[in-house]
Amino acid sequence: MSRSYNDELQFLEKISKNCWRIKKGFVPNMQVEGVFYVNDSLEKLMFEELRNACRGGGVGGFLPAMKQIGNVAALPGIVHRSIGLPDVHSGYGFAIGNMAAFDMNDPEAVVSPGGVGFDINCGVRLLRTNLDESDVQPVKEQLAQAMFDHIPVGVGSKGVIPMNAKDLEEALEMGVDWSLREGYAWAEDKEHCEEYGRMLQADPNKVSARAKKRGLPQLGTLGAGNHYAEIQVVDEIFNEYAAKKMGIDHKGQVCVMIHSGSRGLGHQVATDALVAMEKAMKRDKIIVNDRQLACARIASPEGQDYLKGMAAAGNYAWVNRSSMTFLTRQAFAKVFNTTPDDLDLHVIYDVSHNIAKVEQHVVDGKERTLLVHRKGSTRAFPPHHPLIAVDYQLTGQPVLIGGTMGTCSYVLTGTEQGMTETFGTTCHGAGRALSRAKSRRNLDFQDVLDKLADMGIAIRVASPKLVMEEAPESYKNVTDVVNTCHDAGISKKAIKLRPIAVIKG
């Protein structure tokens, strides 16, 4: 029985300038309410999607994002509310940009791979340099080419960092500690990673042989899709104090952003877990509104296996970004004929966008241990939080928001308000407005490349035919997304970056 669009609207209420409430009853069995953050233009997109779904036009097999936020609110053990961030768009199970927290002390509470996503620990790392735009402009093309030559890119790309099966086992367990030991990372890189680049509960034995086989050749590679390495320049500084703490002191300063994840290995870990969980749901009689929300009780063998395998895939992704950092440092050193150290190629921060983690949060005045699912959303802890690096204790955690190819990116900082409202979580990027298939139908790849060239952006692409999927037109406007988070107070703007070169899968 489907309701009309007007009937659906009765369950939606605007509670502040940037926030809507989804009341219980919007979908069956909601344990808690839902909320989503939008500004006027993002709001239109959300409601348009719901209206189309009511007419019977689905979103490529996915439910509209609002319905997905509601269905997550119906999962066993969820606390407080199911939260949609401004870049939310429909995805597998959970919408991308939907976060939810589950009570670790509730025996019914679940973990859902759909709440993490297939690209486990897909994330972003930002490096700074002491170069200025004027240093890079004359050698921009050489630099883009050097990065393209150093970093293996594209769908089936193979890594250049030598690795055998034993190395992979160790990397899955150790994360950035492996890169450090092998000489592919600097000691201080680790300080500036979420989780210090290593999830301790990782167990390589919970990663299937098939996943390892997919992961072994891909280490230190940039995938296709929305993965990229970008040379960027500082375009605007909103918070000078925070920027200085990050080593950013003037407009025009050159940075490098690396966006990548756990490649085929993470995808296989998620796929394997979904199969195991379908069985667990039958056994434990867990009922969900959407079968894509396959899940298992956190304490069940399937739940624990997934968390250990997911942590290992997370570690793989950190090693992957560390390896690409190593290759980026080499490329810059070669072009500028100096050492990475002399170029001050330090990691500002490294964040994850797709992960589930155990965290302490205050809910209704009580501290609780929660399993926080962040899918297409970023941890944004406030100043003085014990889990962020010493350097950022006074500023709050840096949050890296990658725009889309050829648009700007942002660095934000976490806030206390975000801690209370969204479990210390904010947006992760622009968020799709057009599906991949639609983008391919509507856009021509040569036009997209020409447009970037007109903007003075050097571009190196391994699979040009995939470029349309990632064209700025396929996405929501990242500035809208970031401003919504800023105005809602769940994170604050620190720095805006614009690209001068893009290296893509």
Swiss-Prot record:
Record-listed GMP binding positions: 226-230, 353-354, 402-405, 409, 428-431, 504
Residues noted as binding Mn(2+) 1 in the record, renumbered to the chain: 119, 122, 227
Cross-link entry Glycyl lysine isopeptide (Lys-Gly) (interchain with G-Cter in SUMO2), positions: 496
Catalyses which reaction(s): a 3'-end 3'-phospho-ribonucleotide-RNA + a 5'-end dephospho-ribonucleoside-RNA + GTP = a ribonucleotidyl-ribonucleotide-RNA + GMP + diphosphate; a 3'-end 2',3'-cyclophospho-ribonucleotide-RNA + a 5'-end dephospho-ribonucleoside-RNA + GTP + H2O = a ribonucleotidyl-ribonucleotide-RNA + GMP + diphosphate + H(+)
Subcellular location: Nucleus; Cytoplasm
Residues annotated as binding Mn(2+) 2: 122, 259, 353
Requisite cofactors: Mn(2+)
Note: Ligation probably proceeds through 3 nucleotidyl transfer steps, with 2',3'-cyclic phosphate termini being hydrolyzed to 3'-P termini in a step that precedes 3'-P activation with GMP. In the first nucleotidyl transfer step, RTCB reacts with GTP to form a covalent RTCB-histidine-GMP intermediate with release of PPi; in the second step, the GMP moiety is transferred to the RNA 3'-P; in the third step, the 5'-OH from the opposite RNA strand attacks the activated 3'-P to form a 3',5'-phosphodiester bond and release GMP.
Protein's name according to its UniProt entry: RNA-splicing ligase RtcB homolog
Organism: Bos taurus
Gene name of the encoded protein: RTCB
